[in-house]
Amino acid sequence: QIGVCYGMMGNNLPSANEVINLYRSNNIRRMRLYDPNQAALQALRNSGIELILGVPNSDLQGLATNADTARQWVQRNVLNFWPSVKIKYIAVGNEVSPVGGSSWYAQYVLPAVQNVYQAVRAQGLHDQIKVSTAIDMTLIGNSYPPSQGSFRGDVRSYLDPIIGYLLYASAPLHVNVYPYFSYSGNPRDISLPYALFTSPNVVVRDGQYGYQNLFDAMLDSVHAAIDNTRIGYVEVVVSESGWPSDGGFGATYDNARVYLDNLVRRAGRGSPRRPSKPTETYIFAMFDENQKSPEIEKHFGLFKPSKEKKYPFGFGAQRMQRLLLMSSMQHIPLRVTCKLEPSSQSLL
């Protein structure tokens, strides 16, 4: 259930072929790509890596206002690579909001989603490739307690029709979830262990649900917000989550290592509100990207541009090998691997 976002805002990053080989050698089987970079798509052929293919915000107007443009986009970036590239989702726009700096794009998100979906449907691929958009947590008006989660009143006219269309298209809503920003913005009320998945006990009791970590609480506030629209049941994909190693309050190597390790350990689990629905999650990001701003955005990578790992943990088979080694060195039975590593298939 774990993937990694492949951003390219750096002038010192490896080639696309090197990056895809790095994904494969580290058993990372899912990727989010923010635009249809042709070199990356070519490198992904026959890799077995499942893909979220992004539509940049700058392309939304053209796709929204002209169905032919959407058909051409799908032909060029989807059909030309399918099925050797396993495109699972198309994310039409990222973190667009009707309030704030991206408000101009908001008018185009739903019609762009509709036109891209219809272009995919015309090829009979709408069951294999789901069309959605990615939002951030600023669209949540109330998140505490999680069961009272709701979207902001001034975004409902924008978001409700999108959720309705996702319900019609049987597609999940993509949400970028960052406990780091919640913690760094309010360290007085949010403890670091709660943000890092290391709290030993329930921190927030919300009726029948108990929360030991902020990630689950934030995720369930989104689930509740969707439920509280009374539109219908729409699943959630966590399309970004990460922790920076430098550049801001609480942004340290150790905090990032602990958060990311625990996020990977969480793979295959649901949330208290939806325990039977494993949460598909994408870590932001593959590399530190030196052309991003502000400064903190430069430090989210799992890898350095040199392809050296920043943190000593792995995915899938790598994690199992590490646990077996630790078990043999310590002469203890490996009794917890089913919890740390739900199954090799769950990390595909």
UniProtKB/Swiss-Prot annotation:
Organism, scientific name: Phaseolus vulgaris (Kidney bean)
EC number(s) on file: 3.2.1.39
GO biological process, one term: carbohydrate metabolic process
PROSITE patterns assigned: GLYCOSYL_HYDROL_F17 (PS00587)
Localization: Vacuole
Proregion span(s): 317-348
Catalytic activity field: Hydrolysis of (1->3)-beta-D-glucosidic linkages in (1->3)-beta-D-glucans
Role of this protein: Implicated in the defense of plants against pathogens.
Protein keywords: Glycosidase, Hydrolase, Plant defense, Pyrrolidone carboxylic acid, Vacuole
Phylogenetic lineage: Eukaryota, Viridiplantae, Streptophyta, Embryophyta, Tracheophyta
Family in the record: Belongs to the glycosyl hydrolase 17 family.
Protein known as: Glucan endo-1,3-beta-glucosidase, basic isoform
Main location: other
Induction comment: By fungal elicitor.
GO CC terms in record: vacuole
GO molecular function, one term: glucan endo-1,3-beta-D-glucosidase activity
